[in-house]
């Protein structure tokens, strides 16, 4: 089997977990054969915004077609 990894950043005004879910949900909606995800980094945007925005960087792996 051969896998490809992509790095995605999900965002949420609620929590880091919701931000990770945002990235994983998007990956599952747009990629086939998603197998696993790893949280790489987390951060909070606190600059010129009224509310904090949680960001979770997620590395998502999916199996390439015909890789068996």
UniProtKB/Swiss-Prot annotation:
Annotated consequence of substituting residue 55 to A: Strongly decreases affinity for riboflavin, lumichrome and lumiflavin. Abolishes flavin binding
| Expression triggers | Up-regulated upon transition to the exponential growth phase (at protein level). Not up-regulated at the RNA level.
For the site May contribute to ligand binding selectivity, which positions are given? 45
Primary site of residence: cytoplasm
Query: What is the role of the protein in this entry?
Result: May function as storage protein that sequesters riboflavin and related compounds, thereby protecting the cell against undesirable reactions mediated by the free flavins. Binds and sequesters riboflavin, lumiflavin and lumichrome. Can also bind FAD and FMN (in vitro), but has low affinity for FAD and even lower affinity for FMN. Protects bound flavins against light damage; Trp-36 rapidly quenches the flavin excited state. Promotes the conversion of bound riboflavin to lumichrome.
One GO CC annotation? cytosol
Q: Which InterPro entries match?
A: Dodecin, Dodecin-like, Dodecin-like_sf
Q: How changing residue 45 to Q/N affects the protein?
A: Strongly decreases riboflavin binding
Q: Its family?
A: Belongs to the dodecin family.
Q: Where in the cell is it found?
A: Cytoplasm, Cytosol
Q: Does the keyword rRNA-binding apply?
A: no
Residue positions annotated to bind riboflavin are 35-36, 55
The name of this protein is Dodecin
Task: Please name the SUPFAM superfamilies in this protein's record.
Answer: Dodecin-like
Chain ranges passing through the membrane: none
Keywords carried by this UniProt record: Cytoplasm, FAD, Flavoprotein
Q: How does it assemble?
A: Homododecamer; four homotrimers assemble to form a dodecameric hollow sphere. Except for FAD, flavin dimers are bound between subunits with a stoichiometry of 6 flavin dimers per dodecamer. In contrast, FAD molecules are bound as monomers, where each FAD molecule forms intramolecular stacking interactions between the adenine group and the isoalloxazine group.
């Amino acid at each position: 089997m051969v896998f490809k990894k992509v790095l995605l950043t999900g965002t949420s005004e609620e929590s880091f977990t919701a931000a990770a879910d945002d990235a994983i949900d998007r990956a599952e909606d747009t990629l086939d054969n998603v197998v696993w995800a790893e949280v790489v980094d987390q951060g909070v945007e606190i600059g010129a915004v009224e509310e904090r925005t949680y960001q979770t960087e997620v590395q998502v792996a999916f199996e390439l077609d015909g890789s068996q």
